[in-house]
Regions:
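Alpha-amylase-like alpha-glycosidases and glucanotransferases acting on alpha-linked glucans and related
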Residues: 1-115
């Protein structure tokens, strides 16, 4: 259900992705011996929306509420729903293009430009 990835050969996270709150977007899970992706808090792992079972479950939730008469849904942080399937490093954004709304000092990468 989540985005899991093996560490690099040296044991570090699978890529250079950063959390919105700073630091790596990856947290180690000792039981699986893998990293899981969290774009926000480590206690909020990202769902793997590339998986059909996850998509189906979310559609079931939407149908549940639609049958109860809700008028719509608010989808928060939608730009974080899908990650690069190949988990490639984010390319550095040239310094002259950085600003606080695109690439603040805590995140010198252009967020998932290669999607």
């Amino acid at each position: 259900w989540y985005v899991w990835a093996d560490p690099k050969p040296d044991g570090t996270p699978p890529n250079n992705w950063l959390s919105v709150f700073g630091g790596s977007a990856w947290a180690w899970h000792g039981g699986r011996e893998q990293y899981y992706l969290h774009n926000f808090l480590a206690s909020q792992p990202d769902l793997n929306l590339h998986q059909p079972a996850v998509q189906d479950a979310l559609l079931d939730v939407a149908r549940f509420w639609l049958r109860r008469g809700v008028d719509g849904f608010r989808l928060d942080a939608i730009n974080f729903y899908f990650a690069d399937r190949y988990l490639r490093d984010n390319p550095p954004l040239p310094r002259e293009l950085r600003n606080d709304s695109i690439a603040p000092s805590v995140n010198p990468y252009n967020h998932q430009l290669h999607l």
